[in-house]
């Protein structure tokens, strides 16, 4: 606090008013760190006033972004939105993309918040690119971030580079694609070359397997156009979380955050994270990949998805929002039409709404789907719910 006060005094005495707003912003950060919110707000107001009087927009820009950052740090994100919107508007209109006052994690956090809410999105993406910002470590996988590489594996397989789909036609060799699929399937971090040899080149000897691995890795890097996206250290391959976004990583993180909030009794927060997770799940992991190494993660993610749908559905049921529960279970069945537990829950909701015909229709669909896909009949529990409708299922 003493150093920031001395810094401000020296700039004021120097007569170089262009730097005085930045000195006030530094002082505001010091007071914020000391939980002296009124003093922090006073310095931000001074920075804004001087910036306006001297017609130096960078001081105004930083004061608004700093105000938004303080609100985000206090978990008062709703209050951050007005300041964030005004600051980013000023930055866009005046062409501000850099600052000599570099404040750790501030730009990262306000940029992530802005992208999530769709505030000045194009300007924010350019701000991120020019400053080579990495996502906030507490929220490391925002899909809206302009990642150099994005990997989509849920319900599809797509690679994106700089927000554009990477096209790979019939001429593209499959081993580089298999390499990144397998890398994601077995964790994406620190996977040994030997493990890839076992999965992708099981019949090759040591030298041939090594040559195949290095060749596939080289082709994959060329396809992605970002060498740094794939890190090879001491024979272990990783996807860089500074350069790559993977839908599976984001999905699992949201599920983890939801479970943590649920265990802490923060139901509203848990629901928000479950909804974020479900928005990412477009279907099974690598649905057209037949290799056995894809199965464990596929089943794990499916279980997480069904658990999230069930939790959201029960939440709606608990507060009597039966129509919302119906919508939730239907969306779940769109992604996984052999999830018998979702059919049961959907039947119960229709019964509670007095929609017996719809409940019976759901049962018939369940019976037909389970028979044709899995070669099995509905469980006794499911048949019991159908029988409770008052009519024998046809």
Report each predicted region and the residues it spans.
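Short boundary/linker motifs that mark transitions into or out of structured domains
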Residues: 42, 115-177, 227-238, 283
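Tandem amphipathic alpha-helical repeat scaffolds
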Residues: 1, 19-35, 62-74, 104-113, ...
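Alpha-solenoid helical repeat architecture
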Residues: 1, 11-26, 38, 51-66, ...
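Residues within the alpha-helical elements of helix-turn-helix
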Residues: 199
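Segments forming glycine/polar-rich beta-alpha architectures that bind adenosine-containing cofactors
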Residues: 182
């Amino acid at each position: 606090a003493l150093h920031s006060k001395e810094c401000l005094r020296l700039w004021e005495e120097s007569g170089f008013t262009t730097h005085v707003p930045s000195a006030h912003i530094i002082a505001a950060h010091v007071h914020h760190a000391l939980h002296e919110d009124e003093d922090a707000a006073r310095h931000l107001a001074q920075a804004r006033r001087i910036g306006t009087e001297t017609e130096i927009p960078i001081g105004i820009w930083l004061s608004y972004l700093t105000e938004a950052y303080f609100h985000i740090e206090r978990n008062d994100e709703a209050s951050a939105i007005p300041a964030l919107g005004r600051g980013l508007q000023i930055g866009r209109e005046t062409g501000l993309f850099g600052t000599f006052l570099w404040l750790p994690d501030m730009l990262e956090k306000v940029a992530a918040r802005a992208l999530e809410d769709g505030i000045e999105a194009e300007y924010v993406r350019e701000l991120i690119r020019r400053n080579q910002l990495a996502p906030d470590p507490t929220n490391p996988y925002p899909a809206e971030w302009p990642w150099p590489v994005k990997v989509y594996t849920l319900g599809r397989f797509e690679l994106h580079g700089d927000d554009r789909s990477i096209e790979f036609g019939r001429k593209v060799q499959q081993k580089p694609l298999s390499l990144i699929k397998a890398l994601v399937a077995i964790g994406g971090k620190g996977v040994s070359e030997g493990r890839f040899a076992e999965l992708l080149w099981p019949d090759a000897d040591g030298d041939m397997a090594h040559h195949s691995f290095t060749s596939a890795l080289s082709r994959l890097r060329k396809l992605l156009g970002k060498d740094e996206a794939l890190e090879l250290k001491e024979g272990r391959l990783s996807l860089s979380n500074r350069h790559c976004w993977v839908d599976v990583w984001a999905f699992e993180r949201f599920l983890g955050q939801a479970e943590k909030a649920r265990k802490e009794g923060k139901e509203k927060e848990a629901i928000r994270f479950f909804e974020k997770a479900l928005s990412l799940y477009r279907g099974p992991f690598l649905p057209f990949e037949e290799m056995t190494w894809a199965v464990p993660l596929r089943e794990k993610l499916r279980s997480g998805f069904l658990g999230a749908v069930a939790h959201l559905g029960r939440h709606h049921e608990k507060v009597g929002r039966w129509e919302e529960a119906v919508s939730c279970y239907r969306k779940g069945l769109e992604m996984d039409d052999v999830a018998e537990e979702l059919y049961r829950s959907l039947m119960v909701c229709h019964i509670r709404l007095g929609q017996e015909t719809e409940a019976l229709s759901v049962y018939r669909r369940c019976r037909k789907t389970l028979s044709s896909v899995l070669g099995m009949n509905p469980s006794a529990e499911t048949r019991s719910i159908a029988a409770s409708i008052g009519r024998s299922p046809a």
